[in-house]
Regions:
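Short S/T/G/P-rich N-terminal loop/turn motif that feeds into the first structured element of a domain
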Residues: 24-111, 118-251
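Positively charged n-region of N-terminal signal peptides that target proteins for export
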Residues: 1-4
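Bacterial N-terminal signal peptides
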Residues: 8-20
């Protein structure tokens, strides 16, 4: 049988619980998710895909950002790395909002110019989809630079949360200082929600690739001879690096 609180004590207790719950909700950072499509493209035609994105897709992503359907977006071009040639991302506070935005924007693009959309799809005719959740950093909220370095990790699934804690404890202060010094525009650590084999994503952006690579070298130097850095490597021991040109993005 449930006990019902009555009178002044009951009201006071309820108010305390209410305000405690509100305080916890305010203290807890908002969830942020990214839906990223990594494209395999015809390398002889990939610049045409960039043109189509600018001519057709971009205005709909700008509008979705302006009306808060999405929290950010970006179109990335491969510079160095694996087989992905282009990447398209957009953010939202929930997974359902991500899926809804994908459906809405895709329908708008096809309705505007199905022929051009199909041409884009033929150039980049295969892809891998991932949903990431932000764990640390500001990459889902900050205006990014024109160049990005992303590392996609394969990790020990039993120790992924330990890797997250190490990033917050060891890596975050280094990245934050690089941002404070103007050497980075953004950085982020994200966890896998849906997608392929990669379990964690570390990404940073800057004004240009030279600046980003210098920042990355600073991070590596700061972690040299740090046993916690070695522990992180034990957990996430395999990775693939990509250097991206951020061709279009918001914010």
């Amino acid at each position: 049988m449930r006990k019902l609180y009555t009178g002044a004590f009951g009201l006071q207790a309820c108010l305390l619980l209410t305000f405690a719950g509100l305080a916890q909700a305010q203290d807890k950072p908002k969830d942020a998710y990214l839906y990223v499509t990594y494209f395999y493209c015809d390398v002889t035609q990939q610049e045409r895909a960039d043109q189509i994105f600018d001519q057709l897709d971009r205005s709909f992503y700008d509008a979705a950002f302006a009306d808060a359907t999405i929290t950010n977006y970006g179109w990335l071009a491969h510079q160095t790395g694996g087989k992905w040639r282009r990447a398209l991302y957009n953010g939202a506070p929930t997974i359902q909002a991500l899926l809804d935005s994908q459906k809405k924007i895709g329908a708008q693009i096809d309705a505007k110019n199905k022929k051009l959309s199909d041409e884009e799809g033929k150039i980049c005719n295969s892809h891998d989809d991932y949903i990431w959740k932000a764990v640390a950093g500001n990459t889902v909220t900050a205006a990014r630079g024109s160049a990005a370095f992303s590392t996609y990790y394969i990790c020990d699934s039993n120790r992924e949360k330990q890797a997250d804690a190490l990033v917050k404890q060891v890596f975050a202060p280094i990245y934050d200082k690089l941002m404070a010094d103007g050497k980075l525009k953004s950085w982020g650590w994200l966890e896998h929600i849906v997608g392929g084999e990669y379990r964690r994503l570390a990404t940073m952006s800057g004004a240009d690739m030279k600046t980003v690579l210098e920042a990355r070298a600073s991070v590596n130097q700061a972690l040299m001879d740090n046993p916690l850095g070695d522990t992180f490597t034990d957990i996430c021991g395999s990775h693939t690096d990509y250097m991206w040109e951020i061709k279009y993005s918001k914010p």
